[in-house]
C-alpha cells in the first residue's frame, strides 16, 4: 500500500543561530510605570517617517502602535509649535514607500488612490518616493501627478535620480533635483537632495538612474556644486529611500564620500529607508544617518546642535525612536511643555482620524473572514516552531493546494514559495479582509515542472544559497544588520514589567528607543520554504530517479529553472537543460486564498 508522507520542511541554510531582535512588534501593552526616554531639542530638529506602506489606521491588534494618522498629525503639529516657541527649527521628512502592505492603501486601484490623500494631509517639509511608488505605471502616475506636482508639495518634493515619462514619451524629473531654503528661526541655509537606491524594476513610466551614476555623469550636480558653494551652505540634508547600513552596496556611504569632496566642512544629515529597521549611523564627526523603521511603528526624531560649546567645530547629534502610540505622543508633548495636561489632539487630527475610519468602513476592511486562534511570527520564532508563520504555511496551508486538473494523487510534489511574499506577523484575533492585505496581499499563479526526485530534493537548498528572490514582499534586512555584530554590545532585556518590542542597537549605543522593551530573538529567514510530499513511508525508500512535480509561484520560474539546470549539471545527469517550455500552469487557489480558507474554519 502506498502511504502519503507529508514532510514539510524549511531550510535554515546553515543560519540556525538566533540573535536579539530589534524589529519585533510589541505583544503586550507596556506598563504605565515604565519611564520613557526623552527627546532632546537642538538648534534644528527633525521628525522622520519612512516605509509606512499604507498603515494609516493604527495597529488594531497591537497596543504599542495604537495611534492612527490623525493622532500622528496632531502630535507633529503640537510638537512643531512648542519647538518653534523655543526659537528652534523643525523639519518634517518622509522617505517613501507609502503603499503595498495595508488594506487602506491596497484595496483600491491603483494602490494608494485614497490613502495618498490622507497621507498628504501631514504638512511635510521634505518628501520623496520609494520603490513601491514605481512598481506599476498607475502607481507612478498617481505619485507624480497627485503628490510630486501638487500645489502643496511641488516645491518640497525632491527626487534627484528618478525621471517620469510623460504621455508623449518626454522624460522629466520626478521631483526637484535639489532645493535650497532657509530655516525660519535659526536662519540656517539648507541644501536638500534625495536619492532612490539602484532600483531596476521600475515601470515604463519611470526611469531610475543609479545614484552614483547620477552624481558623476549628470551635469546638474556639477552645476549645483559650482553655484551652491560650501561657504553659502550651513546644512546639507540628503534624504531618500536607501538603507543607512548596507554592507553589500554601501550606496549611502559612497554618496557621502562624493558629496564630502565638495563640502568637506559642512554638516550633512542623512535620512534613509527601505530595509524596515530602526538604525542610526555616524558617517563622520559632522554627519549621521537616521532610519526610522516601518509600518507606522516608529516616529524618528533627530536634533542637531550646530555648534558644540566646547568644540565649535563639532555639532551635537541626538536621536530617538518614538513608538507610534498615543501614550508616547502624550508623554513627549507633556515633557516638552512641562504640562501633564497638554492637549494631544487637534481639530485637524480628529478630522483625519475620522477620514481613516470612514475609508476603512467604505472598503469593508473589517469584514470578518475567520478567526486566528494564536499568534504566528515571521522571524522571532524558529522555523520549526508551531508559532512560526512559515511553519504554519508549509505544514497546514500548502498541503491544501489541490488544482482541478494537474493534481495527481500518486505523484510526489515539492511546493516552494519565496518568503518575501509574507509581509507581516499574523496576530491572534479576527481574520479580516484587512488581515489579508497585511500578511499576504498578493495573489499568485502556480507553475510546475517535472524532474527526478534527486533533483527536486535539492532545489530548496540551492535557492537558499543564492541571492534574494525578487518580489513585492518585504526587503530582506538580515544582511543590512551585520554591523550590529550580533547585538553583543547591548544586553538582552528580560523584564516582567516590559512588553516585547524594539530594542535597537546603533552607532550611538543601546538607548535610542523611547520606550524600553524586552528583547526578542530573531531567526534568519531563508529565501524559500517548501512543503514536501513524498508518496512513500520514508523518503529514503523512494526511487531517486522517479519523476516528481516541483510547484512554484510563476514569478519564480527563472530562479527554479536556474536551480534545476545547475543541479542537473552538478550531478552529471544525462538530461538536457530545461527551459520555460518545460514549465506548465498548475492551477489551484493562491496562497492568500488557502490561508483565508484555513482560518475560516475557526
Which positions does each model-derived feature cover?
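Detector for methionine-enriched segments
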Residues: 1, 121-122, 186, 224, ...
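Classical eukaryotic N-terminal signal peptides for Sec-dependent ER targeting/secretion
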Residues: 1-9
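Non-catalytic terminal accessory segments
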Residues: 7, 14-47, 64-67, 77, ...
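Acidic, metal/ion-coordinating pockets
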Residues: 19-312
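A generic signature of intrinsically disordered, low-complexity regions enriched in glycine/proline
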Residues: 55, 101, 312-315, 327-329, ...
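Short, solvent-exposed aromatic-acidic interface loops
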Residues: 196-198, 239, 315-336
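Compact beta-rich and alpha/beta scaffold cores in large eukaryotic transport/transcription complexes
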Residues: 234, 256, 285-289, 299-301, ...
Amino acid at each position: 500500500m502506498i502511504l502519503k508522507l507529508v514532510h514539510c520542511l524549511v531550510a535554515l541554510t546553515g543560519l540556525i543561530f538566533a540573535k536579539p531582535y530589534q524589529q519585533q512588534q510589541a505583544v503586550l501593552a507596556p506598563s504605565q510605570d515604565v519611564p520613557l526616554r526623552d527627546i532632546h531639542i537642538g538648534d534644528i530638529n527633525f521628525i522622520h517617517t519612512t516605509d509606512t506602506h499604507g498603515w494609516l489606521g493604527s495597529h488594531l491588534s497591537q497596543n504599542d502602535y495604537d495611534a492612527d494618522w490623525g493622532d500622528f498629525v496632531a502630535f507633529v503639529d503640537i510638537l512643531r509649535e512648542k519647538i518653534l516657541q523655543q526659537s528652534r527649527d523643525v523639519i518634517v521628512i518622509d522617505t517613501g514607500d507609502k503603499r503595498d502592505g495595508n488594506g487602506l492603501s491596497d484595496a483600491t486601484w491603483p494602490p494608494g488612490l485614497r490613502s495618498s490623500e490622507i497621507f498628504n494631509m501631514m504638512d511635510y517639509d521634505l518628501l520623496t518616493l520609494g520603490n513601491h511608488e514605481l512598481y506599476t505605471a498607475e502607481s507612478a502616475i498617481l505619485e507624480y501627478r497627485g503628490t510630486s506636482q501638487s500645489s502643496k508639495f511641488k516645491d518640497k518634493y525632491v527626487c534627484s535620480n528618478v525621471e517620469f515619462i510623460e504621455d508623449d514619451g518626454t522624460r522629466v524629473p520626478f521631483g526637484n533635483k535639489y532645493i535650497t531654503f532657509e530655516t525660519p528661526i535659526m536662519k540656517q541655509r539648507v541644501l536638500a537632495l534625495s536619492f532612490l537606491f539602484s532600483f531596476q524594476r521600475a515601470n515604463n513610466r519611470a526611469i531610475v538612474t543609479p545614484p552614483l551614476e547620477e552624481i558623476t555623469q549628470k551635469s546638474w550636480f556639477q552645476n549645483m556644486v559650482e553655484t551652491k558653494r560650501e561657504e553659502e551652505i550651513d546644512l546639507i540634508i540628503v534624504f531618500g529611500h536607501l538603507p543607512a547600513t548596507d554592507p553589500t552596496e554601501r550606496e549611502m556611504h559612497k554618496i557621502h564620500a562624493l558629496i564630502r569632496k565638495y563640502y568637506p566642512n559642512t554638516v550633512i544629515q542623512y535620512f534613509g529607508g527601505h530595509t524596515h529597521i530602526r538604525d542610526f549611523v555616524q558617517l563622520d564627526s559632522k554627519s549621521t544617518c537616521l532610519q526610522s523603521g516601518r509600518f507606522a511603528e516608529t516616529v524618528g526624531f533627530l536634533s542637531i546642535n550646530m555648534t558644540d560649546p566646547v568644540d565649535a567645530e563639532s555639532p551635537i547629534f541626538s536621536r530617538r525612536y518614538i513608538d507610534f502610540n498615543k501614550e508616547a505622543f502624550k508623554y513627549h508633548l507633556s515633557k516638552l511643555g512641562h504640562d501633564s495636561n497638554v492637549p494631544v489632539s487637534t481639530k485637524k487630527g480628529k478630522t483625519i482620524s475620522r477620514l481613516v475610519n470612514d475609508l476603512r468602513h467604505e472598503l469593508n476592511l473589517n469584514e470578518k473572514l475567520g478567526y486566528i486562534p494564536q499568534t504566528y511570527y515571521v522571524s522571532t520564532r524558529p522555523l520549526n516552531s508551531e508559532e512560526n508563520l512559515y511553519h504554519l504555511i508549509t505544514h497546514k496551508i500548502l498541503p491544501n493546494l489541490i488544482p482541478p486538473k494537474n493534481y495527481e494523487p500518486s505523484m510526489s510534489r515539492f511546493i516552494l514559495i519565496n518568503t518575501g511574499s509574507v509581509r507581516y506577523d499574523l496576530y491572534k484575533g479576527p481574520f479580516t479582509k484587512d488581515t489579508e492585505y497585511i500578511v499576504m496581499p498578493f495573489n499568485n499563479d502556480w507553475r510546475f515542472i517535472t524532474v527526478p526526485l534527486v533533483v527536486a530534493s535539492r532545489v530548496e537548498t540551492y535557492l537558499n544559497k543564492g541571492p534574494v528572490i525578487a518580489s513585492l514582499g518585504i526587503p530582506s534586512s538580515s544582511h543590512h544588520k551585520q554591523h550590529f555584530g550580533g547585538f553583543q554590545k547591548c544586553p538582552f532585556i528580560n523584564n516582567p514589567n516590559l512588553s516585547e518590542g524594539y530594542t535597537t542597537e546603533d552607532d550611538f549605543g543601546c538607548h535610542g528607543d523611547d520606550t524600553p522593551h524586552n528583547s526578542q530573538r530573531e531567526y534568519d529567514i531563508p529565501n524559500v520554504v517548501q512543503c514536501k510530499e513524498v508518496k512513500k513511508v520514508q523518503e529514503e525508500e523512494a526511487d531517486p530517479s522517479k519523476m516528481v512535480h516541483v510547484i512554484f509561484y510563476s514569478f519564480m520560474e527563472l530562479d527554479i529553472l536556474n536551480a534545476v539546470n545547475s543541479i542537473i549539471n552538478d550531478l552529471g545527469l544525462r538530461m538536457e537543460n530545461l527551459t520555460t517550455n518545460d514549465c506548465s500552469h498548475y492551477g489551484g487557489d493562491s496562497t492568500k486564498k488557502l490561508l483565508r480558507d484555513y482560518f475560516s474554519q475557526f
